[in-house]
């Protein structure tokens, strides 16, 4: 076959052949013609440009009629030539005898024989594309578009916020359906058919207060969210208003580790049979985790709604408060789930006040005789309002759970607590001291991995001790305390040095000077002093804390003590008012 492609040559002629072969009108049946593509300038040789190229055989398959388009231009020549080919080749000429054949006998003669350079692929693309076919680059297209007006941007942001709100409502419907599978499925079936003897009395642990959560969302909260579709401004008030009601999620999460343990015992037998009987796709454990996931999801959706609502130029003050609420409640839920995995503590954790913080420290604990151990141990430390608990993390989950568990090791009551900060100038180290009923001192040295963690704990512990100190001072001298508070408020400045400042709490040399003089050193006297001696026991503390305070006039009316509560503790107390 003529013009066959030889190995090692450029593939450009083959590309041209494939493109031209798709247009059957360009060739007469049985005709053969040789085309030669020019070099880098993009022009076409005379054999192709004229439309009546020199024939490859003794007679031409095409006649040089007046319909020939003539030599095309350097860029769009090939396209113009293709556009006129159908008209030019409409009259089929006589083919040489024995030369006629199907389209597969066509062959384009490469220009390699003439020594001409073949064009690059980019040039071929330019030839095949007409000047009107070129697509504008994205950058130029973006620049050419007129920037959106501020009103259009706000409109789009508002539309996106409504999309987030719609997603919130739709996912709420799905959430209620999932809770219904538990309450109207598992719980109703177990109540009707009874439970195995080994599970009797423990079925309430499995479900906790999930029925209460389900009924509230089904009968009230879902309808309120649907109302927000017509009145989006109501969304923020909805979450702020029901902050206390959302405390039921904290109760549920506190019970969740116990529920996981019971379900793990019966999940492969009894609960699996119930699932097949009810025809549910999800297992019971997958449904029981839905409330935990949902309380986290509210936070994410509210943040997205706040972002777009703010871009739309709407008032977002209430929304920011709602986001703050829904960031706080999930944190409390997570804390309660962690506490549910604490084992070995004799007493009720719920009676120790709110969990204010938890972190992992390298702790040097006291041994027999009050001396510090020669080596430290890794401990998970929990800070409550009334107690500090030291625990050891277990390698695996507790009683079949997937999350890490903790075993109680030691504790310090806040009423016996003292604080020493920045030991030996190290911002990562501080000490907590505990005074026993017989006056003995136990000292725990804590070292954090990050100075920020250590300083945060020093601040939180100091704040607790300061609040307790103020409360005791108010009990001992309510008139003087009230007068001091009135003077502070009238001057419009904070009441004394801030938490962790040298004026209130000596975290430097004074704290290191006497390891047996904790900041709250006089508090244990409340446990030992008989009635009537409390005031005398607290007198040194009162003088140290309050200094020289002017005496109140004798005719001053008695004022009841009003110890202040930090805002964060006030919010915690608000959540703890259980109206469920």
UniProtKB/Swiss-Prot annotation:
Residues 48-76, 128-157, 482-524, 545-580 are annotated as: Disordered. Residues 48-67 have a biased composition (Low complexity). One of its GO terms (cellular component) is extrinsic component of membrane. Residues 467-493 are annotated as: Sufficient to bind activated GNAQ. SUPFAM superfamilies: DBL homology domain (DH-domain) (SSF48065), PH domain-like (SSF50729). Residues 509-520 have a biased composition (Polar residues). One of its GO terms (biological process) is axon guidance. Residues 348-466 form the PH domain. Keywords: Cell membrane, Cytoplasm, Guanine-nucleotide releasing factor, Membrane. It holds the Pfam family SOS1_NGEF_PH. Residues 160-336 form the DH domain. Residues 278-299 are annotated as: Important for binding to Rho GTPases. It comes from the Eukaryota. Isoform 1 and isoform 2 are highly expressed in excitable tissues, such as brain, heart and muscle. Also detected in kidney and liver. Residues 555-566 have a biased composition (Pro residues). Changing residue 478 to A: Reduces exchange activity mediated by GNAQ activation; in truncated construct. Changing residue 479 to A: Reduces exchange activity mediated by GNAQ activation; in truncated construct. It is found in: Cell membrane; Cytoplasm, Myofibril, Sarcomere. One of its GO terms (molecular function) is guanyl-nucleotide exchange factor activity. PANTHER family: PLECKSTRIN HOMOLOGY DOMAIN-CONTAINING FAMILY G MEMBER 4B-RELATED (PTHR22826:SF117), RHO GUANINE EXCHANGE FACTOR-RELATED (PTHR22826). Interacts (via the DH domain) with POPDC1 (via the C-terminus cytoplasmic tail). Interacts with activated GNAQ and GNA11. Interacts with RHOA, CDC42 and RAC1. The guanine nucleotide exchange activity is autoinhibited by the PH domain. May play a role in actin cytoskeleton reorganization in different tissues since its activation induces formation of actin stress fibers. It works as a guanine nucleotide exchange factor for Rho family of small GTPases. Links specifically G alpha q/11-coupled receptors to RHOA activation. May be an important regulator of processes involved in axon and dendrite formation. In neurons seems to be an exchange factor primarily for RAC1. Involved in skeletal myogenesis. This is Rho guanine nucleotide exchange factor 25. The gene is ARHGEF25.
């Amino acid at each position: 076959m003529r013009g066959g492609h030889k190995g090692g040559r450029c593939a450009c002629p083959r590309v041209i052949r494939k493109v031209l072969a798709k247009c059957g009108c360009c060739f007469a049946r049985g005709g053969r013609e040789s085309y030669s593509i020019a070099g880098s300038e993009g022009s076409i040789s005379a054999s192709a440009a004229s439309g009546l190229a020199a024939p490859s055989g003794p007679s031409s398959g095409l006649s040089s009629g007046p319909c020939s388009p003539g030599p095309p231009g350097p860029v769009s020549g090939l396209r113009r030539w293709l556009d006129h080919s159908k008209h030019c080749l409409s009259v089929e000429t006589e083919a040489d005898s024995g030369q006629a054949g199907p389209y597969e006998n066509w062959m384009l003669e490469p220009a390699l024989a003439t020594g001409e350079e073949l064009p690059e692929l980019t040039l071929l693309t330019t030839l095949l594309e007409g000047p009107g076919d070129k697509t504008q680059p994205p950058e130029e297209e973006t620049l050419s578009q007129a920037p959106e007006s501020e009103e259009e941007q706000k409109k789009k942001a508002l539309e996106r916020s409504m999309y987030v709100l719609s997603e919130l409502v739709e996912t709420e419907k799905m959430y209620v359906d999932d809770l219904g599978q538990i309450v109207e499925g598992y719980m109703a079936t177990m109540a009707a058919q009874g439970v195995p003897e080994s599970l009797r009395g423990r079925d309430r642990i499995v479900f906790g207060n999930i029925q209460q959560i389900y009924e509230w969302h089904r009968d009230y909260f879902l309808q309120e969210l649907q109302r927000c579709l017509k009145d989006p401004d109501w969304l923020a008030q909805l979450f702020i208003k029901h902050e206390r009601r959302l405390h039921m999620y904290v109760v549920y999460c506190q019970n969740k580790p116990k529920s996981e343990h019971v379900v793990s015992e019966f999940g492969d037998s009894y609960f699996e049979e119930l699932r097949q009987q009810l025809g549910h796709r999800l297992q019971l454990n997958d449904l029981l985790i839905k409330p935990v996931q949902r309380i986290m999801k509210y936070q994410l959706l509210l943040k997205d709604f706040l972002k777009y609502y703010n871009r739309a130029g709407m008032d977002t003050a209430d929304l920011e408060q709602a986001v703050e609420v829904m960031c706080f409640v999930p944190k409390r839920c997570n804390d309660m789930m962690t506490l549910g995995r604490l084992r070995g503590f004799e007493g009720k954790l719920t009676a120790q006040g709110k969990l204010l913080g938890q972190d992992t420290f390298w702790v040097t604990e006291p041994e027999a005789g009050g001396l510090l151990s020669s080596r430290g141990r890794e401990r998970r430390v929990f800070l409550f309002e009334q107690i500090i608990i030291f625990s050891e993390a277990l390698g695996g989950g507790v009683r079949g759970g997937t999350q890490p568990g903790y075993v109680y090791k030691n504790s310090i009551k806040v009423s016996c607590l003292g604080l020493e900060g920045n030991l030996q100038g190290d911002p990562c180290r501080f000490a907590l001291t505990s005074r026993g009923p017989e006056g003995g001192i136990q000292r725990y040295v804590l070292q954090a991995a990050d100075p920020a963690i250590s300083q945060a704990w020093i601040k939180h512990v100091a704040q607790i001790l300061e609040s307790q100190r103020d409360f005791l001072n108010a009990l001992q001298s309510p008139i003087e305390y009230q007068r001091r508070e009135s003077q502070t408020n009238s001057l419009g400045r904070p009441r004394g040095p801030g938490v962790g400042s040298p004026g209130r709490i000596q975290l430097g040399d004074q704290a290191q000077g006497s390891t047996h003089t904790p900041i709250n050193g006089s508090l244990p006297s409340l446990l030992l002093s008989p009635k009537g001696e409390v005031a005398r026991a607290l007198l040194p503390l009162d003088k140290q804390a309050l200094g020289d305070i002017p005496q109140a006039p004798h005719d001053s009316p008695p004022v009841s003590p009003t110890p202040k509560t930090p805002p964060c503790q006030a919010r915690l107390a608000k959540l703890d008012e259980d109206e469920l």
